[in-house]
């Protein structure tokens, strides 16, 4: 039996409160723009309105976040992107739990047989631990080494 942390939320863009949206943008900016030096124009890509947002609120912050990108937007299959855990919440199993919850949601709510993602190479082991397999050579995205991975569902 898996014991899950409380406070996981899964919402469409128009279901997010302004406070939640602000928290998500702030966490994404902290991780992707400040830590990883990705430029704002690449991080804020205009797809959020089409996505489903998975996040964990802890200590008044969005501690962990990812988004589900519908089939046909970016990839021909459904995809998971913008995966993050704030620095102070890392190394606690939160990312793996979030991916498991996200994949369960996709399996229950979408008719697709594959989930695709563009993984930062340093996080490859995390994605493999929840069943993803690498399907590409390493490539650069926003100046960071990535590889395409997928999981059959």
Per-range role (PLM):
Residues 85, 91-104:
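Conserved acetyl-CoA-binding loop-helix of GNAT-fold acetyltransferases
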Residues 116-118, 128, 133-148:
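Conserved catalytic-core motifs of GNAT/GCN5-like acyltransferases
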Residues 44-49, 72, 140-141:
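A short beta-turn/loop motif at secondary-structure boundaries
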Residues 99, 106-119:
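Conserved GNAT acetyl-CoA-binding A-motif
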Residues 71-80, 90, 109-113, 142-145:
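A conserved beta-turn-beta hairpin within the catalytic core of GNAT-like acetyltransferases
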Residues 98, 123-126:
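Conserved short alpha-helix immediately C-terminal to the canonical SAM/SAH-binding motif I
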Residues 2-43, 48-53, 57-61:
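Short amphipathic alpha-helix that is part of the acyltransferase structural core
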Residues 55, 61-70, 77-84:
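Conserved beta-strand in the GNAT
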């Amino acid at each position: 039996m898996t014991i899950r942390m409380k406070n996981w939320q899964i919402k469409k863009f128009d279901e997010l409160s302004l406070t939640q949206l602000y928290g998500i943008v702030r966490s994404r900016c902290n991780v992707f723009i400040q830590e990883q030096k990705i430029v704002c124009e690449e991080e804020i890509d205009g797809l959020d309105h089409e996505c489903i947002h998975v996040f964990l609120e802890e200590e008044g912050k969005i501690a962990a976040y990812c988004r589900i990108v519908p089939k046909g937007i970016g990839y021909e299959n459904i995809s998971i992107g913008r995966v993050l855990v704030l620095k102070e919440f890392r190394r606690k199993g939160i990312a793996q739990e979030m991916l498991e919850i996200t994949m369960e949601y996709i399996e229950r709510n979408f008719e697709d047989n594959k989930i695709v993602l563009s993984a930062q190479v340093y996080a490859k082991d995390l994605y493999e631990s929840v069943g993803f397999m690498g399907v590409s050579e390493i490539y650069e995205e926003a100046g960071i080494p990535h590889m395409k991975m997928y999981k059959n569902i």
